């Protein structure tokens, strides 16, 4: 009985804090026993919403809640599961959980429910990763991509790719068995064509995943400009609250400031950078270096200029940075447009600058940002949603490339070896059974109760 209890896990599945409803999840062989103990019900029907009182180990009433029992294997984890839907808040849910744990049930580790679902064959790793990412989705488009992956879109690609590699591998094994025979040209061409097609498909998926990665991670938008052009004021205006210190003293912002803000259907990472100029101040120089680093990995760059001041060498330096980043999405904005315009616009007119001030221009700016974000994220291509997935398909692609030369030279054992490595790599996307460390790391990033 003790082992039965310890093999059963429990956790609060909803966010900690004030809410209308909280959910406590219990999974394992003792789940039904615990449900009966704390509800005092003698009969609990599967998939039936029981409105019941819940009691602690001293028989004191905790709350009235909805209790649902999912009989194995027809549950998320494939095990016996009971879920308690109680009134929200920080006290009631915790007392119910404490009562469950007092009977010898173990507190679940982060991601342990999903890990059990994986080991019980209810989900594969692509679906598990999609569940984890969906919780943190940064846009509507991201949620759609992740929902498709939860339904098996990536798993289908993995299975199809694996089958194609296994067919080529089967050919090679037959050819090894009949090594004295010449390999027919049409079989050779068929294998090469199949492998080339798979490599091209993988490259397209990887390229699309890098290009659209901001859908999953959150697109990064960096504001750059010389000191005291109003970058921090722009950040505060876009956030709708004062996050950065605003001062007339040049160089007030000495480090990058990053915050999340919603633009249209996207949650972006908005970065206010230190003013870029020549400086002998050690601290300011570090801030400028970080500014340049933020620019390099940003999806969109807002280059801000002060319309109330004449164009100078520091503005020229900002434009030089912008000119060198033609592969980036650039928005040029002229700040303080409500003051007398002194900035010579000839140098920046080709960028179709947007005029902004403390009183106007932000609607046009946010609409342009939204349009760019939509264009970066658009596409129907399959996406890889984690570094682990990208690394696996790249290993498969490299192994396929390594296999082609031995095939052309008739070195079938080497061809077979590289193809087996490709099969292992592509299969590891959905089922890397050979590495407990990978599984622990991946499921450990899930939230508690998931």
From Swiss-Prot:
The record's free-text note on cofactor binding: Binds 1 potassium ion per subunit.
Cofactor: K(+)
Main location: cytoplasm
Pfam families in alphabetical order: MMR_HSR1, MnmE_helical, TrmE_N
Molecular function (Gene Ontology), one example: metal ion binding
Binding, Mg(2+): 232, 253
Name of the protein described by the UniProt record: tRNA modification GTPase MnmE
Species of provenance: Sulfurovum sp. (strain NBC37-1)
Organism classification: Bacteria, Pseudomonadati, Campylobacterota, Epsilonproteobacteria, Campylobacterales
Gene: mnmE
């Amino acid at each position: 009985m003790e082992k039965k209890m310890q093999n059963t896990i429990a956790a609060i599945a909803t966010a900690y804090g004030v809410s209308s409803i909280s959910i406590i999840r219990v999974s394992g062989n003792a789940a039904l026993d615990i449900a009966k103990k704390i509800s005092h019900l003698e009969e609990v029907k599967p998939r039936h919403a029981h409105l019941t009182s819940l009691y602690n180990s001293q028989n004191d009433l905790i709350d009235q809640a909805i209790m649902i029992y999912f009989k194995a294997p027809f549950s998320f984890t494939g095990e016996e599961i009971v879920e308690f839907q109680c009134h929200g808040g920080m006290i009631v849910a915790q007392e119910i959980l404490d009562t469950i744990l007092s009977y010898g049930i173990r507190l679940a580790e982060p991601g342990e429910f999903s890990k059990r679902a994986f080991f019980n064959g209810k989900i594969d790793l692509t679906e598990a990763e999609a569940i984890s990412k969906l919780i943190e989705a940064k846009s509507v488009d991201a949620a759609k991509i992740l929902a498709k992956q939860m339904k098996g879109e990536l798993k289908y690609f993995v299975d199809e790719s694996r089958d194609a590699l296994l067919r080529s591998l089967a050919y090679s094994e037959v050819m090894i068995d009949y090594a004295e025979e010449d390999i027919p040209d049409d079989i050779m061409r068929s294998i090469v064509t199949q492998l080339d097609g798979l490599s091209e498909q993988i490259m397209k998926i990887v390229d699309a995943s890098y290009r659209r990665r901001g859908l999953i991670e959150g697109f990064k938008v960096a504001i750059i400009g010389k000191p005291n052009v109003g970058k921090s004021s722009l950040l505060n205006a876009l956030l709708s609250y004062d996050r950065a210190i605003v001062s007339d003293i040049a160089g007030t912002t000495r480090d990058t400031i990053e915050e999340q803000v919603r633009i249209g259907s996207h949650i972006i990472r908005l970065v206010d950078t230190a003013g870029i100029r020549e400086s002998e101040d050690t601290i300011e120089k570090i801030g400028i270096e970080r500014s340049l680093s933020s620019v390099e990995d940003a999806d969109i760059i807002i280059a801000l200029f002060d319309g109330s001041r004449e164009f100078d060498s520091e503005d020229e330096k900002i434009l030089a940075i912008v000119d060198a980043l033609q592969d980036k999405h650039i928005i040029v904005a002229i700040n303080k447009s409500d003051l007398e315009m002194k900035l010579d616009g000839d140098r920046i007119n080709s960028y179709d600058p947007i005029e902004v001030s403390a009183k106007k221009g932000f609607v046009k700016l946010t609409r342009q940002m939204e349009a760019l974000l939509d264009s970066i994220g658009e596409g129907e291509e399959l996406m890889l949603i984690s570094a682990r997935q990208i690394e696996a398909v790249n290993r498969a692609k490299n192994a396929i490339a390594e296999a082609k030369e031995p095939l052309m030279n008739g070195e079938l054992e080497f061809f077979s070896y590289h193809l087996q490595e490709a099969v292992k790599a592509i299969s590891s996307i959905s089922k890397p059974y050979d590495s407990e460390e990978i599984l622990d790391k991946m499921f450990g990033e899930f939230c508690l109760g998931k």
